[in-house]
């Protein structure tokens, strides 16, 4: 199971490892806290339109390596709060999927926007 904040975090982080694990027979599930609705260059799009695009892109990228399940929690991009509600959602997905390994992003890594 991979838990990340945004679509494309996995592709920039651990998709190669996930591809190898899937080729070796593992089942991988992605859990995305947001749908990346604020992280799109076309400012004419509504958040809902951006969300649909980002999710479609993530679905396509995951399909390339054989990921069969993606869970979108759809918290507002850029406004995620580490609260009890989020933790309950994450625990629910972990209990449901029962992964042997949970992969996440490095909490000390900082993304610097080029915009």
Language model: regions and residue ranges:
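Active-site rim/loop-helix segments in enzyme catalytic domains that contact anionic ligands
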Residues: 1-98
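Active-site adenylate/phosphate-handling loop in enzymes that bind or generate adenylated species
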Residues: 93-115
């Amino acid at each position: 199971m991979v838990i990340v904040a945004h679509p494309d975090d996995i592709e920039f982080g651990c998709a190669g490892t996930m591809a190898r694990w899937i080729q070796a027979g593992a089942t991988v599930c992605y859990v995305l806290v947001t749908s990346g609705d604020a992280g799109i260059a076309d400012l004419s799009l509504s958040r809902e339109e951006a969300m649909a695009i980002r999710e479609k892109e993530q679905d396509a990228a995951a399909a390339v390596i054989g990921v069969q399940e993606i869970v979108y929690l759809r918290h507002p991009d850029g406004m995620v709060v580490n609260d009890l509600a989020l933790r309950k959602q994450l625990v629910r997905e972990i209990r449901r999927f029962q992964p042997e390994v949970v992969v996440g992003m490095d909490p000390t890594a900082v993304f610097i926007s080029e915009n």
